[in-house]
Regions:
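Hydrophobic beta-strand segment of the Class I
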Residues: 81-82, 131
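Polyanion-binding catalytic cores of nucleic-acid enzymes and NTP/SAM-utilizing transferases
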Residues: 245, 253-261, 269, 273, ...
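Conserved Class I SAM-dependent methyltransferase catalytic core
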Residues: 109-182, 652
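Extended hydrophobic-aromatic, low-complexity segments
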Residues: 3, 90-94, 132-133, 142-147, ...
């Protein structure tokens, strides 16, 4: 957190080494890691003030040594504080009521030190400073001493904002948390409450705030505005009315709206105009489209009149105009990025440039309805991570870093059945330029050949699966498959096919077998003369004109392989598998050789690039993904609209009477089946009673 906040502040401060870092860690290993990380990130050691100690027991900063801390203590205030203290930590509050950090607000309870950490940080904040602290939700509503502290913080206008975070965003705990933003001096008395609990994406077992979520939170904080189902600017009077309870759901309802269901549409069909009207934002953006899709069947209900909803939307004039307007708004954007990033590559400040480009994107999309600007920011941010890393290397190592290649190190197990791993080299990779990008631009033919081969390998694998699934149970029991019956055993397949081919005969095969029984040259030559129908020229002959045994056996096998077994026979399937295995084996060898050649050629290409080509590749790596990603945003709008309309159409497509007809039809079919059953009197009485429940009386009654 220290590194991130320092980097964010540095873009607004001219000069280097202008930021001092203060931190205190209770655990020694964390303390050591903190110092090491700060130094490794290039922060001047003179600007690092990190101590191993108990923050709640000993105020920090600043005293010279533990022995003379009372005599040498000097209050140090900072401009910004960020912290994530242990949640609801136990502590010793004894005699802490006289501690200057707590005496104006109160002392946190023994079992929960959350407010103790908060007050410690607030105490060290400059009058114009700002602090953020991550806390459990309980600090917002718990009573007792915590309520007293919370009330004082509110009455003194210290609380700027409260941000509810998604659950499970921190490793090791699923506790829902908040960020509380505080200032020592504020001119406003209201509190901005943000519910960002639904702003996340799944990342394994945890949830993760996306760049777009963080940006939306920050923008809302800066604007201090209420946003439906997301944020509310709450007055101090409202907080007083709620008895200083700051529990987020009291002020912000972020729950999803319940889906409406119209009883008339359920019974008679048709789509309520009220539900069509709920898509008003789309109808405003695409004039005339509603009338193109829907036709009224009464004053209050309509139906879909378009044969194909997706085509009707995509081909409508106002939709086409909308897409054209969007793309027009980004005219010259790629060139602008190139000027900012590529032309000034050694001096560009990635952090400040990102903000400028973000503002540019927002300005370009401001007048384009329905465009999610935060989705646009996410596209920029995801690609900017790569750009920032590359710029850091180029600016730190020099322009020649672009022409470097590095060993591609991967972690592998030493032995398959052991957990011990080792790092080994698997080929090479570009230091800056990805091999795949270079190959696509300069070695497209070679790359295409490899990709085609790999696609064929996938086809072969799918063909194995198809053949496996076609086998009967007794066929699977043979040795041609492995123990799990999910793959063929090459050796066994070949043996099976060889055995099956043994009985294959033809005049030429029989003649060749007879030829193999001959021992003397004159007999062999005579046999060749006497049997001209044999394709002797298809075999390589010895110097004396005879044909050797290997060549004859190969020809016999070739002729036998030409034999067609019945298509669905096991012999035909195994013959197909054997041929596929031979093709697969040969293809893997070819692909391996092609990859080795392509890698060597790629390395040579990167090392010998001219400056113009190098910069063009950077443009393709950095700028093209941003431009193409932003280009998809209007398509996302159209896709969302089509989905909404299709859902409406299917929602009321089946009426209650339709369901009843299907139900009666199914009941009739079932009753016919029941009537055909025979059994004991008790069974038949039971079935008769069952038919009553289905609305059908026993004919005997």
């Amino acid at each position: 957190m220290l590194i991130n906040i320092g980097a964010s502040m540095a873009q607004y401060i001219e000069g280097e080494n202008k930021i001092d870092y203060y931190a205190q860690e209770l655990k020694e290993n964390t303390y050591n890691l903190t110092r090491m990380n700060l130094v490794m990130r290039g922060i001047n050691p003179a600007n690092i003030n990190v101590r191993n100690g108990d923050t709640l027991e000993d105020d920090w900063p600043f005293f010279e040594t533990d022995e003379n801390k009372d005599e040498t203590y000097s209050l140090v205030k900072v401009d910004a504080v960020v912290s994530n203290p242990p949640y609801s930590q136990k502590w010793d509050p004894k005699n802490k009521e006289f501690d200057p950090r707590f005496k104006e607000f109160g002392v946190a309870p023994k079992a929960k030190a959350d407010y103790a950490f908060l007050l410690h940080e607030l105490y060290h904040l400059e009058d114009d400073g700002i602090m953020t602290i991550i806390l459990p939700h309980g600090v917002l509503f718990r009573g007792g001493e915590e309520e007293t502290i919370r009330k004082t913080l509110i009455e003194r206008n210290h609380i700027e904002a409260i941000i509810g975070l998604p659950a499970n965003i921190f490793f090791g705990t699923g506790i829902p948390t908040i960020i509380m933003v505080l200032k020592r001096t504020r001119s406003d008395s209201d509190v901005l409450i943000i519910d960002a609990s639904k702003k996340f994406e799944k990342a394994g077992k945890n949830n993760k705030l996306r760049a777009r979520d963080i940006r939306e939170i920050v923008d809302t904080l800066k604007a201090r505005k209420s946003v439906t189902k997301f944020a509310k600017l709450v007055t101090k009077d409202d907080i007083r009315k709620n008895e200083y309870n700051l529990n987020i759901p009291r002020y912000v309802d972020s729950s999803d709206d319940e889906e409406p269901w119209d009883i008339h549409s359920i019974m008679f069909g048709g789509i309520p105009n009220m539900e069509i009207e709920s898509l008003r934002k789309y109808w405003d953006a695409f004039p005339g489209l509603r009338e193109e899709i829907f036709g009224n069947i009464s004053d209050n209900y309509a139906r879909v009149i378009a044969d194909d909803i997706e085509s009707a939307v995509s081909n409508f004039a106002s939709v086409s105009n909308y897409i054209a307007k969007y793309h027009s708004s980004f005219s010259g954007f790629g060139e602008h990025l190139k000027d900012c990033l590529i032309e000034d590559i050694l001096d560009v400040n990635a952090q400040s440039l990102k903000e400028n480009i973000c503002i540019d994107i927002f300005n370009r999309t401001t007048n384009i309805k329905l465009i999610d600007q935060y989705k646009a920011f996410q596209i920029l941010s995801e690609n900017w991570e790569t750009i920032t890393a590359d710029l850091e290397m180029i600016q730190g190592e020099g322009f020649d870093a672009i022409f470097q290649v590095d060993p591609n190190m991967v972690v592998k197990k030493k032995k398959e059945d052991e957990d011990e791993v080792t790092e080994v080299q698997e080929g090479w990779k570009g230091h800056i330029l990805p091999f795949e990008l270079v190959q696509e631009e300069f070695h497209h033919g070679e790359l295409f050949a490899i990709q085609s081969g790999e696609e064929r390998l996938v086809e072969i694998s799918n063909m194995y699966t198809e053949i496996l699934e076609s086998l009967e149970e007794d066929e699977l029991e043979q040795t041609i498959t492995n123990d799990d019956k999910n793959a063929f055993v090459g050796k066994e397949v070949k043996a099976y096919v060889t055995e099956a081919l043994t009985d294959v005969e033809s005049p030429e095969i029989n003649a060749l077998k007879n030829y193999l029984t001959l021992s003397f040259k004159k007999d062999k030559m005579a046999f060749i003369e006497e049997n001209p129908f044999v394709a002797w020229s298809a075999m390589v002959s010895n110097k004396d004109g005879t044909i050797g045994k290997p060549a004859v056996n190969s020809r016999i096998l070739q002729l036998q392989m030409e034999f067609e077994f019945p298509e669905e026979s096991l012999e035909a399937k195994m013959k197909r598998v054997m041929l596929l295995m031979e093709e697969e084996s040969e293809l893997k060898k070819v692909i391996k050789a092609q990859k080795i050649e392509l890698e060597a050629a790629t390395i040579e290409t990167i090392k010998n690039l001219n400056e113009e080509d190098a910069l063009r590749l950077l443009e393709l790596k950095w700028i093209e993904p941003i431009v193409s990603g932003l280009g998809t945003l209007p398509d996302d709008v159209i896709t969302a609209l089509v989905s909404e309309v299709e859902n409406l159409n299917s929602k009321y497509a089946t009426t209650y009477s339709d369901i009843e007809v299907k139900k009666e039809s199914a009941a009739g079919s079932l009753i016919q089946m029941i009537d055909g059953l025979s059994g004991s009197k008790d069974d038949l009485d039971g079935l008769a009673e069952f038919k009553k429940y289905m609305g059908v009386k026993n004919e005997k009654e």
